[in-house]
Amino acid sequence: MIPTATYRLQFRNGMTFDRAAALVPYLKNLGISHLYASPIFTATKASTHGYDVTDANEIEPSIGGREGFERLVAELKAQGLGLIIDIVPNHMASSLENAWWRDVLEYGKESRYARHFDIDWSRRLTLPFLGDTFDAVLENGEIAIKPDPATGKPTFAYYDNYYPLAPATWQGREAEILALTDKAAIADLHERQPWKLMSWRDAARSLSYRRFFEVTGLVGMRVEDKTVFDDTHRLILELVRTGAVDGLRIDHIDGLADPKAYLARLRQEVGPACYITVEKILAKGEQLPDDWPVSGTTGYEFIASLAEVLVDDEQIDNLRQAYETVKGAPVDMRAELRAAKLLMVDRNFEGEFTRLLALALSIASELQIAQEESVVRQALRELLIAFPVYRTYGTAEGLPPTDICLLHRIVERVKTLENPPQPEALTFLSRLLTGDVPTSSLEEATQFRVRFQQLTGPLMAKSVEDTLFFRQNMGLALNEVGAEPVTHHFSIERFHHEMKTRQARQPDALSGTSTHDTKRGEDARARLYTLTEAPEQWSECLARWRQMNQTHVKFLNDGTAPKSADTWMLYQALTGVWPPMLQPQDETGLNALKTRFEAFVEKALREAKLRTDWVDSNEAYETAMLDYARYLLAPDNQTFLQDFYRSLQPFIRAGLVNSLTQTVIKLTAPGVPDIYQGSEALNFSLVDPDNRREPDFATLAQQLDQLTPGVFSREESWLNGQVNQYVTAALLRLRQQNHELFRFGDYIPLRAVGQRADKVIGYARVNHDDALIVVAPRLVFAECDGLLSQSHSGFWAGTDIIIPGQLNQHRYRNVLTQERLMPGEHLSLASHQGGVLVLMSD
C-alpha cells in the first residue's frame, strides 16, 4: 500500500512503543496514513539513534521489546494506520555487545560469522578502540588479563571492555593465563590473537574492515551473500509477512556491494505490496536507476528543489559578495570542493584508498601491464575526486551503459586538469571499472569496482555535507543534505521541471523537508532563505552585531577567534534557530537556547576541519569560540540581544511565509509527504543531536483540536506553529480523500501575470475530472507583514494566475477557508487575501 503521508518518529531517548501508541489517535486526527519508525532493533546500550544494531533479530528491549511493539501495531491497526520501519542492511555495531562480532573476535576466520562482516582476512582484524597505541596502553597499566564477568573466560580487559581470547591461546592453561602480569608476556599473548588492539587515531589508515563512512564503531555487512542476507533479515521479513510492517526504509543503500541485487532479493522476499524507499542522495539531474524495484528515495532531492522557489536568484550574488567581503577573499567553490575531497582521500579515507590502490596494482601485475605505483596513485586519486555523484552501480557483469557514459565524462574531465594523470593509467582504471579485462582477472576487477563504488559515496558525503558545508557559510540554508556544492542559478522553471520529472519517475517517493540527518529544521531553513532577499539589510545587521560583541574576540597564536568568517556563520546560525516567540529578557529561554547552540558550534567547528577537528581538537580555539557564542546569549548582553531580536523580526515574518509555502508545496506536489516529528507545526532545530529532541506532543494534540480557519488572522498563530499545523492537517485529510489525484495526477505549471507575478508560484494537479489548483507566495520579504494577518490584499492588486481551459470550467472549494468560487480564465489574487490558495474541484 502506498502511503498518503508518513510521520517519522524517533525512538529511544524516552520514546517507547507504548508512548508511541498513545500518539496514534493524534496522528490519525492529523491525517497521517503511516507511522515511520526509526530503527527498532536491538542496538548498543548507549545508542541514541538505533543505527548501531547489535541484534537484527530482536526488537530493542529498552523501548518495549516484542510485546511493546505488538501493542503499538495493534493500536495502529485499530486506528487504520500502517507502519514503516527503518532497516540498516549496510552495517552493524562493531561492539562487544554484538554476539556475532564477539564470536568473530574469539574464533577469528573460523567463526561462523567471519564472512558476515566485510573484513579483510589477509591480516589480523584491527580493533581501533584504544586511547593510545597498544604498547603505550599496556605500559600505563590500562590493559590486563581478567575473566569476563559474564563467562569467566580469560580476556584482554580495557576498562569496561573485555576482548575474548582465541581458545587455542588459553584453553588448558586458564589459571596461568589469568595470572599473567608480565607486560612482555601479555604483549606476546596479544600477538597470538586473530585481532589486534590499536589506537583510534590509526583507524583511517590501518583498518581491516569496511566501516560506515568514518565510524569505526559500525562495521560493514556482506548482505550480498545469501546466508548473511537471511541471517540479518529473518525478523524483518517475519514482520512484513505477518502484516505488522507495511513498508521498509533502506538506510544507506549506496554502501552495499550490489544495491540492485539486494533490492531484487528483498522485493522477492517481501512481495509487491510492501512499500520500499531508499536513502539515496541524488545530484541535480541525477535519477534513481529505473530497474530498482522501489517506490523512490526518502526525499533529500525534494529539499534541493524547494530552494528553486524560495531563493532570490536576482540578489543572491549580493549576499555572496557581502560574504566574501567579510571573509576577506573571494570563494571558489570548485577549488574548495577539491580541497575537501583531497583531505578525505589523503587522510580520512587513507586506508580505503590504499587498499584500492593495492588491488589495482595487483591486477596490473597479473596482466603484466607496466604501471608505476605513483602513476596509478595519481590517476586513482583524481578519478575519485572528480566523481560528481555518489556512485555508479556496476555489477559482476560490469557497468550499465549510463554509468559507462558517466565514467567517460569523468575521465575526459580529469584529462583537462592542469597536472593530469597519465592517460594510460586512466585507461587501465577505466578498464577495471567497466570489466574490460581478461576472464582470469574478472573476479579481481569486480572486487576493485565494488570497493571503488563503496568509497565514492562516503568520500562525497564527508567532503560535501560534513566538510565543505561547514567551511563555506554564505547561505546556511543552502548547505543541506542533497544540495549542490557548486553555485547555480535558482528558478521556478527548474522547480516545475523537477516536479514533472518527479511525477513521471518516482511519484511515490517520500518528500521530506526535515529528517534526523538534515543540517537544520525546515523552518530554520525557510527563514534563512530570506537572507537572499535582503542581503544588504543582513550585512548591515551583521556589522553592527560584530561591533557590539568585539570585546569578546580573542587573539590566539593562530589568529583571532572568532575570525570574521566565523562570525558570519555564528550569527546566521543563531538567526535560523531563534524561537519566534523568544523574548530577549527571557533568561530561562536564553539558557535553554545557549545549551543547544554551544553543542552546534562545537560540531560546526570540528566538521569544518580548519582550525580544529575531531581527530586533533584545538582547545584554545574551541574555548574562545564557545565563550563568544555563550556571550551572545548571555542574559546580561541586553544591548545586543534587544538589537538582534528587533532586527530579526522581518526575517522571522518572511520566514514564516516561506514555511507556509514550503508546507503547501510539500503536501500537494508529486511525492508522499513525510512529516518529521513536530514539524507539522514549526521546526527550528540545529544539526543532530539537536534535531532528535522530542517535540511537545501534548501541546500539538491539544492545539490541533482547536484549530479553525481563523488562525490565519492571528499573528500569534503564525509564531507558535498553529498556521502550519492547521494547513498540514487540512491538506493531509484532502490527500486521504483524493488519493488517486495526488498519486497519479499530472503536474501542470500555472503562469502568473501582473505586478507581482514573480512573487507567486502556481501549479495544478489533474487526474481525469479531479483538479487541484495551488498558489503560494514567495520572495515577499519587503512586504510580508500583511500576509501574516491576510489583510494585505493590496499587495496582490493586478496579479492574476492564468487558468488554462481544462481547469477554468470547474467550481472549486478553497480547502483552507471553505470558500467556493469559479475562477474563470484569470484567478485574481487581490480578491483572495494572503496569496495562499489550495482549490479543490467540486
Q: Which stretches of residues belong to each language-model region?
A:
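Short low-complexity, flexible loop/linker segments enriched in glycine and/or proline
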Residues: 50-52, 94-107, 263-265, 291-293
